[in-house]
Amino acid sequence: MSSSLKDKRSVLRKTIHRLRTHYNCAVAEVDDHDVWQSAILAVVTVAANRAQVDSLLAKVMHDLETASDFQVVEQELEYL
């Protein structure tokens, strides 16, 4: 857990880099930029079919949920 914006940004930088490196997805912090207690991340991917998207996002969520440096409180999926 972070106790300052500097700590939060360090954790996010490492997490975003890990997700981008291990999975074929784009990741960005989309809200709560200046709130050290929380972060809102968006993970985006494109695939030939929905099953591939579901599989990748399930792996990403598992990665995030098993991380020890933060806690996933809520998730939301949107398909376009």
Model-predicted segments: where are they?
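Surface-exposed beta-strand edges and their flanking turn/coil or helix-capping segments
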Residues: 7, 40-42, 56-58
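Short, charge-patterned binding micro-sites
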Residues: 28-49
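A generic structural micro-environment signature
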Residues: 11, 18, 33-36, 70, ...
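A short linear hydrophobic-aromatic micro-motif
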Residues: 25-31, 72-74
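C-terminal structural segments of small proteins and small subunits
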Residues: 45-80
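A broad, low-specificity signal for short, low-complexity segments enriched in glycine/proline
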Residues: 1-7, 33-35, 48, 79
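Broad gene-expression machinery/nucleic-acid interaction feature
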Residues: 22, 40, 74
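N-terminal first-folded block
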Residues: 1-21, 26, 63, 67
